[in-house]
Amino acid sequence: MSIRIKLKPGREKSLDRRHPWVFSSGVHNIKGKPLRGETVDVVAHDGRWLGRGAWSDASQIQVRVWTFDKEEAIDRDFFARRIARAQAGREALIREKGLTGYRLVGAESDGLPGITIDRYANVLVCQLLSAGADYWRETLVSVLAEQFPECAIYERSDVDSRKKEGLPLVTGLLHGELPAMPLIIEENGIKIAVDVEKGHKTGFYLDQRDNRAMAGRFVEGKSVLNCFCYTGTFGLYAAKAGAASIENVDVSTLALDTARHNMAINGLNDDHVTYSEADVFKLLRQYRDEGKTFDVIVLDPPKFADNKAQLNGACRGYKDINMIAMQLLKPGGTLLTFSCSGLMPADLFQKIVADAALDAGRDAQFIERLSQASDHPIGAAFPEGFYLKGLVARVW
């Protein structure tokens, strides 16, 4: 007999729409004593079967649903099918863009809640962020080793969200032999250095690939200020597209050193590139006070809101930084601005940037709305998967 989670009356509606989360507030009772991460069946208050997922006693999300098919067992074959499907769905993109770095599995949006897997050359980097993902760790490694025998497998489960699942932060080699860092990946004919051990997230921001390429349309012969540049890839694309000058700004010495390395491995002269180790907010205010201006500014900040309680503060932060950036733009200049917080609705982000233009005393036109690259799909039943929002604004 399976372990069964019965929901309170009326709490089945989201599962009927195939949303994969069951919150603790919706649970009526539990039949059995599930281990953390163990597979459980979820039923409506009237006993109707709804889904099968992983139990988490520590999290507010107490079940993350693996399948809505009553006949589908959660076993090694299940994970093999889901991972193979995820790879198959990305094959055309890999060929088209010449990718050696891409997101292989995007958690809930690929039907594998809590499991993120990125490929960098011949290394697969896993983040196992839920109790269920952690429970099936050995099975996942076995499946990946079978389907990608050429790849080492490395874990970067050093994300605070694991604490909400009652799990420790973990990093380390899971399979094979890790090559020397940095790895070199390619996208759109451009080489990028990635350190999967010390880099942000799994090592790099693959989700901005299309936006980096698109930015090249605006920069030929222009001065570019690339804020929160990390390893300088917006600047790298700008250099390739013929920007007259580029300033890469980040607080990390290591990131800026990698930005220099990225220019070198692409055979690009960086005499027209400067690297500023600085707090972006302070530097933008300094430049405003000095009367400095630019043709193009990129704002790609880290996440400002990790939870709903932080959203109001995040709104103020986004408004402030976009206002100052607009004040630094020459008339007719271009602002590329992003939010990577899943809690920030796209319409609210656009309103914040519009309000920033008013406060800056500038006229602005939105000419592009941007999102994450297509190897970061958004599940139709999981709108939370739409986390990266971007705008291109022409500022007068």
UniProtKB/Swiss-Prot annotation:
Record-annotated PUA domain positions: 2-79
EC number assigned by the record = 2.1.1.191
Q: What enzyme category does the UniProt record give?
A: transferase
Q: So what does this thing catalyse? A: cytidine(1962) in 23S rRNA + S-adenosyl-L-methionine = 5-methylcytidine(1962) in 23S rRNA + S-adenosyl-L-homocysteine + H(+)
Compartment(s) where it occurs, according to its Swiss-Prot or TrEMBL record: Cytoplasm
**Record bears the keyword DNA repair:** no
Question: Does the keyword Ion transport feature in the UniProt annotation?
Answer: no
Which residue pairs form cystines in this protein?
Answer: none
Q: What is its main location?
A: cytoplasm
MF terms from GO for this chain are: RNA binding; rRNA (cytosine) methyltransferase activity
Provide this UniProt record's keywords sorted from A to Z.
Cytoplasm, Methyltransferase, RNA-binding, rRNA processing, S-adenosyl-L-methionine, Transferase
Return the InterPro entries for the record: PUA, PUA-like_sf, PUA_sf, RLMI, RlmI-like_PUA, SAM-dep_methyl-trfase, SAM-dependent_MTases_sf
Q: GO terms for CC?
A: cytoplasm
Q: What this chain does, per the record? A: Specifically methylates the cytosine at position 1962 (m5C1962) of 23S rRNA.
Q: Which family does it belong to?
A: Belongs to the methyltransferase superfamily. RlmI family.
Q: What protein name applies here?
A: Ribosomal RNA large subunit methyltransferase I
Give the source lineage, highest ranks first.
Answer: Bacteria, Pseudomonadati, Pseudomonadota, Gammaproteobacteria, Alteromonadales
